[in-house]
Amino acid sequence: MFHPRARTMLLLSLPALIIGVASSLVLIAAMKIASVFQQFLWQRLPASIGIAYDSPFWIVGMLTLTGIVVGLIIRYSPGHAGPDPAIEPLISMPVSPSALPGLLLALIIGLAGGVSLGPEHPIMTINIALAAAFGSRLFPRITALDWTILASAGTIGALFGTPVAAALIFSQTLSGSNDIPMWDRLFAPLMAAAAGSLTTSLFFHPHFSLPIAHYTQMRLVDIASGAIVAAIAIAAGMVAVWCLPRLHELLHRLKNPVLILGIGGFILGILGVIGGPLTLFKGLDEMQQMAFSQTLGAGDYFTLAVVKLAALVIAAASGFRGGRIFPAVFIGAALGLMLHAHVEAVPAAITVSCAILGLVLVVTRDGWLSLFMAAVVVPDTNLLPLLCIVMLPAWLLLAGKPLLAANRHEP
């Protein structure tokens, strides 16, 4: 009844569904545990001893302690809590399963402790390793590369609550041929991404969109404004690109992860005191609070963007286990709101979406993901043509430029 191509796709459907659901459940479990732990550390515990959670003493002390604990996990756990996210790309080959408990624990403590990184890199590493370890036993004919693709697609769908991001990302890597069309290759990853996003939606839905005024009609001047905003965001991001490898090398001369992360946590605490609680944690909930605030002005948005960018660099350079996409979205939103406050003639929909596009492009160097993040934070179909046009000069600016990553050091 089915063509052999269709039968091949159907055979991959079951593993794809299982991987997608499992990827989402791992993410949900980690986020729920981190959320409970965060409420205890930042609400119940300080209230029980009569200290304000936003006091300088508590912020500096909590982040310093978080750094020390994560450092102890990295030093003494099997596999040293997985690869350093500052060195490894978001999607890479499977790591040893023995490193996963330490990696998961380091992630949860970092998220709960207020570190300015998201969950995407460790969750991706965990899901890829689990998929390869269990999948190779259950379905030995499927290669490790296929398990990596399915797990990463399922994780992307779970992280962003939609399979669209995975479809966009893998459409540029799983190109078709005369024998196998691109959509044949995309079928199983898209199935995994759909399963991951639907499973996530049963428990919670990521809140990316901001309450920003509707963009009515594209004008020529808006394209120029958007390109300038994206260029400003790229310039800010390139400062981080320059700083990260140098700071990473400087800190890792100490050799001891407990000392490195303790110092990193202390600096993050100082930055948290300067920027306030909005600059702590992964940034999604804080971005909503920032957008809904009626008291913040241009200077406040500028401070939030600069402090969060510095915190992102410090956290990544120190070796905290976390991702850089979610903080980059926060930085882009803060930068966009600041630019709109300075030049109100440029709609906030343009400044925010184009700033996010520029920052995420610097962090990921992935045009589709950058467009996707800009479009989901400012969900306005009238903006899509403008964002696609603005992407062109932004991509030209970054062509051949170094990535936001540290260099490997000899032990």
Curated annotation (Swiss-Prot):
<dbReference type="InterPro" id="IPR001807">
    <property type="entry name" value="ClC"/>
</dbReference>
<dbReference type="GO" id="GO:0015108">
    <property type="term" value="F:chloride transmembrane transporter activity"/>
</dbReference>
<keyword id="KW-1003">Cell membrane</keyword>
<protein>
    <recommendedName>
        <fullName>Putative ion-transport protein YfeO</fullName>
    </recommendedName>
</protein>
<feature type="transmembrane region" description="Helical">
    <location>
        <begin position="296"/>
        <end position="316"/>
    </location>
</feature>
<feature type="transmembrane region" description="Helical">
    <location>
        <begin position="322"/>
        <end position="342"/>
    </location>
</feature>
<feature type="transmembrane region" description="Helical">
    <location>
        <begin position="258"/>
        <end position="278"/>
    </location>
</feature>
<keyword id="KW-0472">Membrane</keyword>
<dbReference type="InterPro" id="IPR050368">
    <property type="entry name" value="ClC-type_chloride_channel"/>
</dbReference>
<dbReference type="Pfam" id="PF00654">
    <property type="entry name" value="Voltage_CLC"/>
</dbReference>
<feature type="transmembrane region" description="Helical">
    <location>
        <begin position="386"/>
        <end position="406"/>
    </location>
</feature>
<dbReference type="InterPro" id="IPR022969">
    <property type="entry name" value="Chloride_channel_YfeO"/>
</dbReference>
<keyword id="KW-0812">Transmembrane</keyword>
<feature type="transmembrane region" description="Helical">
    <location>
        <begin position="54"/>
        <end position="74"/>
    </location>
</feature>
<keyword id="KW-0406">Ion transport</keyword>
<feature type="transmembrane region" description="Helical">
    <location>
        <begin position="9"/>
        <end position="29"/>
    </location>
</feature>
<keyword id="KW-0407">Ion channel</keyword>
<keyword id="KW-0813">Transport</keyword>
<feature type="transmembrane region" description="Helical">
    <location>
        <begin position="149"/>
        <end position="169"/>
    </location>
</feature>
<comment type="similarity">
    <text>Belongs to the chloride channel (TC 2.A.49) family.</text>
</comment>
<feature type="transmembrane region" description="Helical">
    <location>
        <begin position="186"/>
        <end position="206"/>
    </location>
</feature>
<feature type="transmembrane region" description="Helical">
    <location>
        <begin position="223"/>
        <end position="243"/>
    </location>
</feature>
<dbReference type="GO" id="GO:0005216">
    <property type="term" value="F:monoatomic ion channel activity"/>
</dbReference>
<feature type="transmembrane region" description="Helical">
    <location>
        <begin position="99"/>
        <end position="119"/>
    </location>
</feature>
<feature type="transmembrane region" description="Helical">
    <location>
        <begin position="343"/>
        <end position="363"/>
    </location>
</feature>
<keyword id="KW-1133">Transmembrane helix</keyword>
<dbReference type="InterPro" id="IPR014743">
    <property type="entry name" value="Cl-channel_core"/>
</dbReference>
<dbReference type="GO" id="GO:0005886">
    <property type="term" value="C:plasma membrane"/>
</dbReference>
